[in-house]
Structures are given as C-alpha cells and as structure tokens.
Amino acid sequence: MAETKVNFSDKLDEMERIKAHSDYLRGSIVQGLADRVTGAIAEEDTKLLKFHGSYMQDDRDIRDERRRQKLEPAYSFMIRVRAPGGASTAEQWIAMDDIANTYANGTIKLTTRQAFQFHGILKRNLKQTMKDINQSLLDTLAACGDVNRNVMCNPNPYQSDVHSEINQIASAISRHLSPKTQAYHEIWLDGEKVLDTSDEEPEPIYGKTYLPRKFKIGIAVPPSNDIDVYSQDIGLIAILENEQLVGFNVAVGGGMGMKHGNTATYPQVGRLIGYIPKEEVVDVCEKILTVQRDYGNREERTNARFKYTVDRLGVDWIRNEINNRLGWQLENKRPYHFEHNGDRYGWTEGSGKWHYTLFVQNGRVKDTEDYKLKTALRTIAEVHTGDFRLTPNQNLVIANVAAHKKNEIEKIITDFGITDGQHYTGLRRNSMACVAFPTCGLAMAESERYLPSLITKIEDLLDEAGLKEEEITIRMTGCPNGCARPALAEVAFIGKGPGKYNMYLGGGFIGDRLNKIYKENIGEAEILESLRPILLQYAKERTEGEHFGDFVVRAGIVEEVRDGQTFHS
C-alpha cells in the first residue's frame, strides 16, 4: 500500500482536494462526455482528464471573434499517446494516421518525449478516439498528469544489443509505474468497475493523491544524450563494460519549467547521486518516485516538481532517504562521456537491418502543397515490415528495414522528396519547438509556427559568418513551461508576449549546462541584431572544436549556469 505522508490541511493546493475526491481519477468525466449542450467538460474534470492523456483546449486564433458573437470558445481536446522509447509498429503508424484524418486536425505531432499527439478532437469524438488508440495496442494513460510520464530512451533498439535491452527496461519501468486505477478502462473502454474503491486501495505506489506534480524518467546511452538526461526527474545513464550493460548512473531532480517573474521557480539539471546495477533499476525508480510522493510540495504547485524537493532537502538527504528505502547503499558514480544530444540522420545499419532517420521539422507530420510528408510515411507504413520510432528530438526513425525492402522504401523516400535533413543547416537540424498557438492555453507567443522562419533569417547571419554547417542547438517555447527543453539549448527563445521573447544563450551542446538570459522581451529585429555580432565573434575567436554555447560562456557574453538556483542571479 502507498503510505503517503500527505496532511490534508487548508494550505494544500486545490488540485490535491480534486485528486483525493476523484474516486481514483473518475470524477464526473462520464457525465461530462454525455453533456451535448457544451463542447467542454467541467473545470475539475479537465484536471483529472490529464491523467487519462488528454487536455481540453480551444482555438485561440478565433477566441476573440467567438466572444464577440457571444459563442462559447471553440473547444476541442488534445490527446497524447504514450509510447515508451518512442516505439510503434508500421500497423500502429497507420492507425495513428487514420485517427489524425478521422478525428483530429489531419496532422500528427511527434513530441519531445517520444509520444504521439493529436489536436482538434471534438468532445463527441473523444471516447471513440481513445478506443481506436487502444485497439492499436497503444494507450494514453499517464501520458499527462501528476504521475510518471512516458519513459524516454534511445529510439532505435536495433542499434545494438545494449540499445535493445535499454528499450526493454524503459518499457518495464513504464509498466511498473503506470497508475493501476480501473477508471481509464471504465470511462474509455466500457469496462466494468471491478472493485469498490471506498474500501480498497487500487494504487499501491501512488495512493489516492498520486504525485504532487508530473514526473519524468529517461535513459541515455553514452555517447548520445539524445533524451537530455539531465532534464529528467530521474535520469539514468547507461554504464557498459566490454560492450555489455552492467548498470546505471542515477541523476535526480532535473526539470525545465519556470514562471516569468517568479525567481523561486527555475530550470534545473539533474544531480548525480550514484550508480546502481541494472537488475535494481525498476525498484530504484519506484523508491525515488515515492520520496517525491511523500516529501514533494503539495501546497504550491509552482514549487511541486522533484527538482525543488531535491534543492529544499539537499542532495545528500535525498540520497540517504533513497538508501534507507532500498535497504542498501547506492554505489559511487562511474565514468561516462557524452558527445551530443541530437539525432543522427540518414541510413545506418545495425543488427543486420537498416534504419533511416528523417528530419521532421518541429515534429509536425503533415502534408503541404510542396511536401507530402504524411502521405509518404503512410505509403512507407503500408509496405514496411519493421517499426516507426519517435526520437526525443521530434524526428522519426524508419527502423528495422529488411535488406530486401530497403530499395523499395528508398524509392518512396525519393519519389516524395522526403529528407533526412542532411542538406539543412546544423542549426535547423538541431532545432525544436513546442506547439504553442493556436491550441495551447499557456502560450504567450508563437513557437512551432514561427521558429522555422526565424531560423531562415538566422541562417543568413550564419552564412555571413561562415557557420552554416556548424551544429548549434536552438529551441523555442511559447511559454516558460519548457516543453521543448529550451533551458538546455545553446540558443533559446521563451515566449513573453505576442511577438516577444526572452533570449537565452550558453547551454551545453551535450545538454549538461543551463543557459542564461541575454536579452529580455525582444522581437525579431532585436533578436537578429543581437545575434549577428556574437556569431561573427564566434567565427573569428573560437578554438578548434569549440561549440557555440561553450564559447559564449568563455567569452564572458553570459555566465555559466551549472545549478538552476543561480539561473536568475
């Protein structure tokens, strides 16, 4: 049983009351779905719906016009489909494509946590969409909410035996930490209520109030830090001996979100607390999660993430508490080395099969007049006998291609003009953006719809400086919640208002260092005006192999930030 140390008092955040009285995430969601008078559901149910993998949203492009017409907002729902390690079969890809066409806005969003995301689903179609997702043997449970989210890892298990083992471990962690309530099956899959929750505890790990906030786990396999291991609540770094996986270094308390104007909130990098044998990894993840369950801040959600718990109680205290719960001591961390946190594009061979990583700008799979990416991928899925793997950088691996199928798939790629991104600049290949407008209710500025055009203008500056092939990470979010992990980028833009961004510089190319604010509340003209002299200086003064983020720190353009507690200082 989950023995939470939650003391219900008037000081607790309202969300804690909602969870406690939700009957294990049921609330009145069923009744809300049946109400045809409105396209919305009750406010409290929107908070519970997140645990089921969905957010209620509205079209912000037409919000003002609908208000003038005295109409309710154009409500719709986003659904996020979890896929541990980004794994999906060709059949599942076809199912996702069908769902996008039938119920959503005709596009698929590949997220920065290796999940599928659909936008524009109307309330009347929400249940059937959930059913169709589950019929494909994927699901949405715990894709959002105050629980462990989609577990990340290198997307290609066929790269080596170690990568295959890592994928299996990611799936095992995901299964073990999934909520056990039957509410999901009752609401979406017409399952019967299988137990009386008034007498029995159906959540042996989480308890009635689940976690104080969302919780994220990722596994990195050096030298690739593609999952941004230091951004995770639990970051696991694979340790190999003689090309065999033996265990993991464990980092705790990473996280990207903050709030503008509130210096008590900040991004943070995970802190290494030791090494564990691979056989213990699922249990260790559970024990760390329960520390956050019991000691996380349930009074103020803005300070409820595990990073704040670690900073408040101290790394040593956290390590000792984990040791006590395990009944054994974490070992000393072991050596490892990261070289990059991006994807490797094009064809590669591994485990006797071929794999093609293609560039998907900001993770949006759609057809345009000039670029039929969605149709091309559907065509590939209809002949492909392997997998589709979602990367942590919003790209896609057509994986496990049999040798006799390679030419056929290569012809489809060529016929549709699909690109692996090799002809793009290093900046564009290393870019990420969140959804932002028009569907995200938190967005303060554009992101996905704007970053590509801004990059085009920055590319002119790179060309002038002779840096067009330089690998530089650039990320943009429409708000400071950090969905595209902007605080780790060498160049980052975080929305402050319409057309205005805070600009940050100096993140580590391998994702190990936070960036620092350089300019506040600036528009495009000032962004370009600010970047030009820095890029020219970088081209002239950099040392051999020196990355842009390292240079701006060394040159004193921004201060180095290794601890989020100094992010605002």
Curated annotation (Swiss-Prot):
In the record, what terms sit under GO molecular function?
4 iron, 4 sulfur cluster binding; heme binding; metal ion binding; NADP binding; sulfite reductase (ferredoxin) activity; sulfite reductase (NADPH) activity
Q: What range does the record give for the signal peptide?
A: none
Question: What are the alphabetically sorted keywords of the record?
Answer: 4Fe-4S, Amino-acid biosynthesis, Cysteine biosynthesis, Heme, Iron, Iron-sulfur, Metal-binding, NADP, Oxidoreductase
Name of the molecule in the record = Sulfite reductase [NADPH] hemoprotein beta-component
Binding sites annotated in the UniProt record for siroheme: C483
What this protein catalyses is: hydrogen sulfide + 3 NADP(+) + 3 H2O = sulfite + 3 NADPH + 4 H(+)
Family note: Belongs to the nitrite and sulfite reductase 4Fe-4S domain family.
UniProt-annotated binding residues for [4Fe-4S] cluster: C434, C440, C479, C483
Cofactor note from UniProt?
Binds 1 siroheme per subunit. Binds 1 [4Fe-4S] cluster per subunit.
E.C. no: 1.8.1.2
Which InterPro entries does the annotation name? CysI (IPR011786), NiRdtase/SiRdtase_haem-b_fer (IPR005117), Nit/Sulf_reduc_fer-like_dom_sf (IPR036136), NO2/SO3_Rdtase_4Fe4S_dom (IPR006067), NO2/SO3_Rdtase_4Fe4S_prot (IPR045169), NO2/SO3_Rdtase_4Fe4S_sf (IPR045854), NO2/SO3_Rdtase_FeS/sirohaem_BS (IPR006066)
Gene encoding it? cysI
Q: What does this protein do?
A: Component of the sulfite reductase complex that catalyzes the 6-electron reduction of sulfite to sulfide. This is one of several activities required for the biosynthesis of L-cysteine from sulfate.
Which species does this protein come from?
A: Staphylococcus saprophyticus subsp. saprophyticus (strain ATCC 15305 / DSM 20229 / NCIMB 8711 / NCTC 7292 / S-41)
